[in-house]
Swiss-Prot record:
Protein name: Zinc finger protein 417
Role according to the record: May be involved in transcriptional regulation.
Family in the record: Belongs to the krueppel C2H2-type zinc-finger protein family.
Gene name as annotated: ZNF417
Residues of the signal peptide: none
Domain KRAB: 15-88
Domain of life from the UniProt record: Eukaryota
Biased composition (Polar residues): 71-81
InterPro entries: KRAB, KRAB_dom_sf, Znf_C2H2-type, Znf_C2H2_sf, Znf_C2H2_type
Length: 575
């Protein structure tokens, strides 16, 4: 086989590494034996060491200074035989530290330690690290990069079948671009996962083998048909989403490990429920469900969690942080899963159809949860009272009734709620928003439930009856509070004055007497009130609304109490 002839020096007295490099074609490389390939590497190393010791530049003429450059070549721990015409025994002083070495190869190895100190220095904080892999991990702390390729191994990747010098090879660039600079080594090969045999014995760079690259640059494929299904694993924010449970992952390896928990019976079995896992760490996290062990407590409310990620998501309830933003509509979310659900609503595609009722769903785990409505399955059980639920979220909300946790606090008045939806509805009291409209009379409400209760006024429906006196009510909660009149029960007591009340809402309003708080402000005149009902009555002064009409004479009034007083005058006249 004929190897390509080395190029001649372009200038008198100037020798570059490419001038003495020997390049093989793809076909020629395949014909080399293992011993010949090892010899090829040794020769290239000797040439590099010789040129470095002479202070020559190892790059092309257009490239920049050699002090920050190095070549990445995989070497085995074997003896290197000096070539003819090369005298390794010579005094070689190191310009960096002053150390003098006689052997040219030892001198080359010594100089490489200085290069590594520069190459493995963090550009953000100047910290030196021992290894390039540690630099990769350290750099992620500065740039927050979650998606990164596999660390470049100590192997020889050569672009376009040439030994190339890499300049600053371990400086991270903007996400989505090459990890290595344009004049460096393995710009395209860095994204390809190579086996040990390919790295040791394969050609320096196999062109045409991985022409199709995933947009995230985490995986490369040999055919276009292979990359398309891989790309479907991503959402718009670049995460891997599990189609079985909706959980999202920033790294493909974490996503792949998680999927094994759904698809395969792992070697780690739970002794309590028999569930199996492919990883021991997953089993340990699962066992905390049975033991109740929670290793991560919230400093704000004291609630504990079995996983650190769950604690981080929970803390956003207190801080109000919503880091996940939809790029199309600008809507923000506190949890990544909520953003994913929202984004899937853009296309409107509902791939999962219920055979029982015909309802469709965008996500598989939502479809699975829905099917439990028909099957009656309730796999999530409360450890306090034994009540079971079909969805985990319903169990979490139910457990707040036992713990008394109210994580959602109104910044206007300080009132806390168990559910975010209740906080949203409450905040409409301060903003004046009333999105629910009665079709009969046009009256507006800030809660859908209040609209449903109000509509019973028009229909005359009163489905809830008092067991003692038979009085009918349109609201179940009103029946519960009313029955306390018969029993004399007043379970809500004020800590300040000891006064007790029938309902928690009445106690909450009463506490404002002691605090002096008046959260309900009139937008017309600025007057404030302690109760929402007082503000509603006051607004009628500005609007002129008189909703209470006398059936006898047709006279209208702003307040029901005034109407009752007026009706008594008709009764007196009748007597």
């Amino acid at each position: 086989m004929a190897a390509a002839a080395p190029r001649r020096p372009t200038q008198q007295g100037t020798v570059t590494f490419e001038d003495v490099a020997v390049n093989f074609s793809q076909e020629e490389w395949c014909l080399l034996s293992e011993a010949q390939r090892c010899l090829y590497r040794d020769v290239m190393l000797e040439n590099l060491a010789l040129i470095s010791s002479l202070g020559c530049w190892c790059g092309s003429k257009d490239e920049e200074a050699p002090c920050k450059q190095r070549i990445s070549v995989q070497r085995e721990s074997q003896s290197r035989t000096p070539r003819a015409g090369v005298s390794p025994k010579k005094a070689h002083p190191c310009e960096m530290c002053g150390l003098i070495l006689e052997d040219v190869f030892h001198f080359a190895d010594h100089q490489e330690t200085h290069h590594k100190q520069k190459l493995n220095r963090s550009g953000a904080c100047g910290k030196n690290l021992d290894d390039t892999a540690y630099l990769h991990q350290h750099q992620k702390q500065h740039i927050g990069e979650k998606f990164y390729r596999k660390s470049v191994r100590e192997a020889s990747f050569v672009k376009k079948r040439k030994l190339r010098v890499s300049q600053e090879p371990f400086v991270f660039r903007e996400f989505g671009k090459d990890v290595l600079p344009s004049s460096g080594l393995c710009q395209e090969a860095a994204a390809v996962e190579k086996t040990d045999s390919e790295t040791m014995h394969g050609p320096p760079f196999q062109e045409g083998k991985t022409n199709y690259s995933c947009g995230k640059r985490t995986k490369a494929f040999s055919t276009k048909h292979s990359v398309i299904p891989h790309q479907k694993l991503f959402t718009r924010d670049g995460c891997y989403v599990c189609s079985d449970c909706g959980k999202s992952f920033s790294r493909y390896v974490s996503f792949s490990n998680h999927q094994r928990d759904h698809t395969a019976k792992g070697p780690y079995d739970c002794g309590e429920c028999g569930k199996s896992y492919s990883r021991k760490s997953s089993l340990i996290q699962h066992q905390r469900v049975h033991t109740g062990k929670t290793a991560y407590p919230c400093e704000e409310c004291g609630k504990s969690f079995s996983q650190k990620g769950s604690l981080i998501s929970h803390q956003r309830v207190h801080t109000g942080e919503r880091p996940y933003e939809c790029r199309e509509y600008g809507k923000s979310f506190g949890q990544k899963g909520n953003l994913i659900q929202h984004q899937q609503g853009h296309t409107g595609e509902r791939a999962y159809h219920c055979g029982e009722c015909g309802k469709s769903f965008r996500q598989k785990f939502c479809f699975i949860n829905h099917q439990r409505v028909h099957t009656g399955e309730r796999p999530y059980k409360c450890g306090e009272c034994g009540k079971s639920f079909g969805q985990k979220g319903n169990l979490v909300q139910h457990q707040r009734g036992h713990t008394g946790e109210r994580p959602y606090e109104c910044k206007e008045c300080g009132k806390s709620f168990r559910y975010r939806s209740h906080l949203t509805e409450h905040q409409r009291l301060h903003t004046g928003e009333r999105p629910y409209n009665c079709r009969e009379c046009g009256k507006l409400f800030n809660r859908k439930y209040h609209l449903l209760v109000h509509e019973r006024v028009h229909t005359g429906e009163r489905p809830y009856a008092c067991e003692v006196c038979g009085k009918l009510f349109g609201n179940k909660n009103c029946v519960t509070i009313h029955q306390r009149i018969h029993t004399g029960e007043r379970p809500y007591e004020c800590n300040e004055c000891g006064k007790s009340f029938l309902s928690s809402s009445a106690l909450h309003v009463h506490k404002r007497v002691h605090s002096g708080q008046k959260p309900y402000k009139c937008s017309e005149c600025g007057k404030s009130f302690a109760e929402c009902s007082s503000l509603i009555k006051h607004r009628r002064i500005h609007t002129g609304e008189r909703p209470y009409e006398c059936t006898k004479c047709g006279k209208t009034f702003q307040r029901s109490s005034t109407l009752l007083h007026h009706q008594s005058s008709h009764r007196r006249k009748a007597l």
